[in-house]
């Protein structure tokens, strides 16, 4: 993936550390840019400046509103992973993206290990986590419940040491709509990472790591992951959560 690397901050050393850690190489011809400002790390689509920048922000804005006034345990993702009563499963979010579903789960009390294989997305996610860790309101529970894994692929996790109750998968899937109708964030993301065409390969390592269930979020029109029929599904207006119970145990 080609990207421009732009430092608009006063901290040149921090910018270089980010580039080195994620092995990012500047390409002046790229239309996507990863930009460090004094406030945050953000992604811009230079040929569509009206789209604005994409950054990870758990502290305020949409995500803070969702934490305070959203459905909490009643949200579809919370029901899909099996949250009930005092039961708060440990979770591996194997396709973490910008961490939004993971944040919902962490906000209601689950511990979530985040895995993200795209280095640019992982850099954005880490930046958002670092800022959240420093926040006086949510910092303590974020440090305890949302951790970015050192590995970029769930197949590299140690089944004996890092298994979780639930493995959650939300692979990118092509949108049916024309790009102009897809919200800005998804348009930029599709340009950055494309569809997860190899997402079927997630299924086997996910089953190995999940003690209770694997949950796969899909658009309502998408086929089952790896052509595997789930034990049951939960549906929302536009999506479907396919649930696979581990080793035929009750979840």
UniProtKB/Swiss-Prot annotation:
Specifically methylates the guanosine in position 1516 of 16S rRNA. The keyword S-adenosyl-L-methionine applies. Its EC number is 2.1.1.242. GO terms for molecular function: rRNA (guanine-N2-)-methyltransferase activity. The keyword rRNA processing applies. It comes from Actinobacillus pleuropneumoniae serotype 3 (strain JL03). This is Ribosomal RNA small subunit methyltransferase J. Belongs to the methyltransferase superfamily. RsmJ family. One of its GO terms (cellular component) is cytoplasm. S-adenosyl-L-methionine binds at residues 100-101, 116-117, 170. Its main location: cytoplasm. InterPro entries: 16SrRNA_methylTrfase_J (IPR007536), SAM-dependent_MTases_sf (IPR029063). It is an enzyme of class 2 (transferase). Keywords: Cytoplasm, Methyltransferase, rRNA processing, S-adenosyl-L-methionine, Transferase. It is found in: Cytoplasm. It catalyses: guanosine(1516) in 16S rRNA + S-adenosyl-L-methionine = N(2)-methylguanosine(1516) in 16S rRNA + S-adenosyl-L-homocysteine + H(+).
């Amino acid at each position: 993936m080609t990207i421009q690397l732009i430092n608009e901050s006063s901290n040149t050393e921090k910018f270089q550390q980010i580039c080195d850690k994620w092995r990012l190489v500047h390409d002046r011809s790229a239309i996507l840019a990863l930009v460090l400002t004094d406030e945050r790390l953000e992604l811009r689509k230079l040929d569509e400046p009206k789209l604005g920048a994409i950054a990870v922000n758990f502290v305020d804005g949409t995500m803070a509103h969702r934490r305070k006034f959203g459905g909490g345990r009643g949200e579809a993702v919370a029901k899909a992973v099996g949250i009930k009563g005092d039961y708060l499963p440990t979770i591996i979010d194997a396709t973490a993206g910008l961490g939004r579903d993971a944040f919902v789960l962490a906000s209601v009390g689950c511990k979530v290990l985040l895995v993200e294989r795209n280095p640019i997305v992982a850099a954005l996610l880490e930046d958002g986590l670092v800022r959240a860790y420093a926040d006086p309101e949510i910092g303590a529970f974020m440090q305890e419940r949302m951790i970015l894994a050192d590995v970029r692929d769930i197949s590299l996790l140690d089944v004996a040491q890092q298994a979780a109750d639930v493995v959650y998968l939300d692979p990118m899937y092509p949108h049916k709509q024309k790009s102009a109708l897809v919200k800005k964030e998804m348009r930029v993301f599709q340009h950055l990472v494309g569809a997860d065409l190899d997402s079927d390969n997630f299924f086997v390592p996910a089953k190995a790591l999940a003690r209770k269930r694997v949950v796969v979020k899909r658009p309502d029109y998408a086929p089952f992951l790896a052509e595997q029929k789930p034990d049951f599904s939960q549906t929302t207006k536009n999506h479907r959560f396919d649930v696979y119970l581990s080793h035929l145990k009750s979840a």
